[in-house]
Structure formats: structure tokens, C-alpha cells
Amino acid sequence: MAPTTLTALAGEKTLQSSFVRDEDERPKVAYNDFSNEIPVISLTKESMKLAAVVDEICRKIVEACEDWGIFQVVNHGVDSNLISEMTRLAREFFALPPEENVRFDMSGGKKGGFIVSSHLQGEAVQDWREIVTYFSYPLRTRDYSRWPDKPEGWRSVTQEYSEKLMGLACKLLEVLSEAMDLDKDALTNACVDMDQKVVVNFYPQCPQPDLTLGLKRHTDPGTITLLLQDQVGGLQATRDGGKTWITVQPVEGAFVVNLGDHGHYLSNGRFKNADHQAVVNSNHSRLSIATFQNPAPEATVYPLKIREGEKAVLEGPITFAEMYRRKMSKDLELARLKKLAKEQQLQDVEKAKLESKPIDQILA
């Protein structure tokens, strides 16, 4: 069972066993060993009016998406003061007394609120993070009873932040459509009525960061994710199935754009779905804000363009709801098998210990 908060655990010298990952899942690269392999792309209004500049932006995005499924954007039009306010309020929320946070506990199937780890039900290992999440689009999905009422100003700022991020997402979908050689409205139309979920991640200092992860390796299910991260570092990406990892260089005020599974399928596999994780450290807490832009549940998932000589990556069209269900079912089954394997390993260790004991000690 997940602890109420990680505040108390952060001060301990050793990590609780529920957070300890198998050796093959542990971090291979330090949180601050930064790489500049992920391109940073400027989206100024002036540059987006120039055909030659747009062509160059599309070229960089194609290269980044074919390679990593990740790029960063600056000069994106989201006001720096709004970003600062959102970040400040998020840090203040996680600094509140635990009893304030758990008023919005989202366990038990509640939509939105506060939770520790947020690992899949049945998983053997927890993530070292606390989150607060809320659903913001379509507007009918907003349940303000699940939006924290502290610190003061939280709701008004998060509403404005959600609105601006939706605008940025629409702009990026147009650019991605052009990068795929499609009409600029192609991806937006494929989403039907875009969903938006905002997840604020807080990663406290960790006593043994080399043994755990802030967020396990995964791909996002949706179209794109816009991630705002502080300057501490911890977002990592792989392009070779987890053999090697890089730590993404934080850029002040930038948004990291991760392509999700939906975007991957719409491109017929040409663009990667970003394979990523978050690591933690013992020196600094870390904050990131992930805005997930997903298609409507009834949206069709199928390649928008199949180039000559290619085969479709999907056997046939499915809804996003069905795609998501299959992904969750697969993740739950993998978690179940991993948990069983771990339990069997512990049983084998205990059995070996027992078999090595003299008979008089066993019967004592």
C-alpha cells in the first residue's frame, strides 16, 4: 500500500523495499548528466509566417520524431509569468501539511486529486513521486470538487494554464500535420474533441535514488504530451529499447513535447512514441507539469497516411478507448507476471535457506 505522502520517507536513510526496483530497471545515467541530443525549436509568430522557416522547423521535428519522439519548444506564446505562477503554486501545494493534500485523495477510482506513486494496481514496485491531477477539457469533464482549493489562486491559475496549453497543443498539431505531409488540420480532426489532463509531479529528495525511479519507463497513450520541467533534471529518454538512456537538458521556460501512442499510430509508426522515464536524486526535489493531449474516446486510431511500400502498423481501425484499454490490460498483465516472478524468487531464496540448515535447527 502506498504511504499517505513521501514527506516522512524522504528523511530516512534507506529506501523502503516497496520502492526498490530490479537491477535491470534502475537508473543507468545520472539525473544531471545532461544531453543536448533533443532539439530545441523556436516557434515565434514571425518565424511561423515564413515558409522557409516553417519548412526548416518541420525538418527538425521530423528528424526528432523519427529518432526519439521528443523535441523541445521555446518562444511558444505561453506567458512566462503564467508559467512562473503555475510552478510557484504547484510547489506550495506539495509543501502543504499532508492532511491538506489527502483531502483530495484520488484513490478508489476518483477522477482527479492527489495520490502517491500512482502505480498500476497490482504492481510490485512503487514510483517515488507525489502527484495532483485534474481533467480540464472538454469543459464538461471538469469536476471542481477534485481541484485543490489551496494554495490561494490555484484554481484560477490552473484554468488559465490549461487554456493556454490547449492553444499551444493545437498549434503543435498543425506543425506536426505539416511534418507528416498532411493538411494542417489533419491531426486536430483525428482527435475529434481533444481531451486534456494535467498531472503535476513532485519528486522529493530520495535517500537511495540509485535503487528506484520517480516514474517508471513508459510511453504515453495520447497524441502529444507537453511537459514543463524545472532546472533540476530527471527526464530520461531511450531510442534503443532501454539499452542506453539520456537525460534531457532542461531549458528555462521550454516545453518538452513527447509524441504518444496515438500520434505514433497516426504516423503509421514513422514517428516514435517517446520511450521515457523519470529519475530522482538525494540533493534536490524536482517538479514537472505534464499536460496530456488525448483524442476523444470515440476517435478512430489508424494511420492517416500510408506511404508507398509501407504496411499499416494496425490490422484495422479501432477507437482510442479500445486502444487505451488494450494498453492498460497489457501493462496490468506485465505487472502481474513481474509480481509473481518476484514472489517466486523470494520463495526460492527462503527455500534455499531452509534446505541449507541442519535438521536440528529446522525442528528447534
Swiss-Prot record:
Residues 191-295 form the Fe2OG dioxygenase domain. Fe cation binds at residues 218, 220, 276. Keywords: Dioxygenase, Flavonoid biosynthesis, Iron, Metal-binding, Oxidoreductase, Vitamin C. Binds 1 Fe(2+) ion per subunit. GO terms for biological process: flavonoid biosynthetic process. Coiled coil: none annotated. InterPro entries: DIOX_N, IPNS-like_FE2OG_OXY, IPNS-like_sf, Oxoglu/Fe-dep_dioxygenase_dom, Plant_2OG-oxidoreductases. Gene3D superfamilies: B-lactam Antibiotic, Isopenicillin N Synthase, Chain (2.60.120.330). GO terms for molecular function: flavanone 3-dioxygenase activity; L-ascorbic acid binding; metal ion binding. PROSITE patterns: FE2OG_OXY (PS51471). It catalyses: a (2S)-flavan-4-one + 2-oxoglutarate + O2 = a (2R,3R)-dihydroflavonol + succinate + CO2. Its EC number is 1.14.11.9. It is an enzyme of class 1 (oxidoreductase). Pathway: Secondary metabolite biosynthesis; flavonoid biosynthesis. It comes from the Eukaryota. 2-oxoglutarate binds at residue 286. Its cofactor is Fe(2+); L-ascorbate. Belongs to the iron/ascorbate-dependent oxidoreductase family. Catalyzes the 3-beta-hydroxylation of 2S-flavanones to 2R,3R-dihydroflavonols which are intermediates in the biosynthesis of flavonols, anthocyanidins, catechins and proanthocyanidins in plants. This is Naringenin,2-oxoglutarate 3-dioxygenase. The gene is F3H.
